[in-house]
Amino acid sequence: MIALPQDRMDQLLKRFSMIESQMANNPDSDTYVKLASEYSELQDVVGKIRELSDARMEASDLAAMRDDASTDAEMRALAVEELPEVEKRIAVLEQDVQILLLPKDAADDKNAILEIRAGTGGLEAALFAGDLFRMYERYAAEKGWRVELVSASEGDAGGYKEIIATVSGKGVFSKLKFESGVHRVQRVPETEAGGRIHTSAATVAVLPEAEDIDIEIRNEDIRIDTMRASGAGGQHVNTTDSAVRITHIPTGIMVVQAEKSQHQNRARAMQILRARLYDMERQKAESERSQARRSQVGSGDRSERIRTYNFPQGRVTDHRINLTLYKLDRVMEGELDELVDALISDHQTALLAELGEQP
């Protein structure tokens, strides 16, 4: 068990009480909004800290009652019976507080840019990319998130060679960030007369949507080209010079948008470029922070095979945490919480272990 930082807990309790007091003194609207936001952020952890404090006090009282020879025998017996249950509750609360005190990922509350690209497997890979996009659409709908299409390159037999969308709502990136990687599918294609199982794959990238304040892009660092959209790769064919290509010169990152509005294409391309640059900085910082460590949920490498969807067996397996669920049909309908929650829990366990190793 990692020792809880009592000083930090006391500071949070003191700050929370101060916020409550200030909110009760009818501050101006701007101040109230800021206080309410901080109040909301602290509410869960402060609630658990208070529960833990009460449980510890209860355990102390029970222990004193048990050890006091002058206490009535029946009361001492009751204390002996109840103390183990309270100690169990304390252990659970300590774990809860530990998790709530973990360093927050600054991007967790951000919206996300979801990119899905067909990989190996030809036509079947494009169909699978489409299935994955619909899976995430349904998951987003269940969460009350908004999905907006940015661009799509359709496959020759359906699905998508590439599809990019924004996902907006509460806690989007915190829930979707572990979806990045290679998703593999094993199934019999509809076009397969012999009934043979084919294996194909699609790559998913989930990027936190970056604001201007998150990443600076200097005008001299980008080159913007406009061109006639040719419709290649399944893009819509445009008859005007509306396609926009933005190149970030220092990194070589290139983003192309080829929808009908040049103005919208430029804005969308900048949105994606900003997200990719921000993601690159996050990946670099994470790599430097933990060069010698690879968390149990995987390295975050986009080329890492993270999950297999086996249709004949009706199972989905996440290879990072060795979790297999035999409810593939429901997963494809957007029931991702069991997978997502297990990945988040595993990540938190890895962070706690890392903190425990620190001197």
From Swiss-Prot:
Xref: InterPro entries: PCRF, Pep_chain_release_fac_I, Pep_chain_release_fac_I_sf, Prokaryotic/Mito_RF, RF-1
Broad class of where this protein is predominantly found: cytoplasm
Positions of the UniProt region annotated as Disordered: 283-309
Keyword terms, alphabetized: Cytoplasm, Methylation, Protein biosynthesis
Signal peptide boundaries: none
SUPFAM superfamilies documented for this protein: Release factor (SSF75620)
Pfam families found in the cross-reference section: PCRF, RF-1
Post-translational modification, as annotated: Methylated by PrmC. Methylation increases the termination efficiency of RF1.
Modified residues (N5-methylglutamine): 235
Coiled-coil segments: none
Gene Ontology, cellular component aspect: cytoplasm
GO molecular function: translation release factor activity, codon specific
Subcellular location: Cytoplasm
Family: Belongs to the prokaryotic/mitochondrial release factor family.
PANTHER family to which the protein is assigned, alphabetical: LD18447P
Biological role stated in the UniProt entry: Peptide chain release factor 1 directs the termination of translation in response to the peptide chain termination codons UAG and UAA.
Name this protein carries in UniProt: Peptide chain release factor 1
Species name: Brucella melitensis biotype 2 (strain ATCC 23457)
Encoding gene (name): prfA
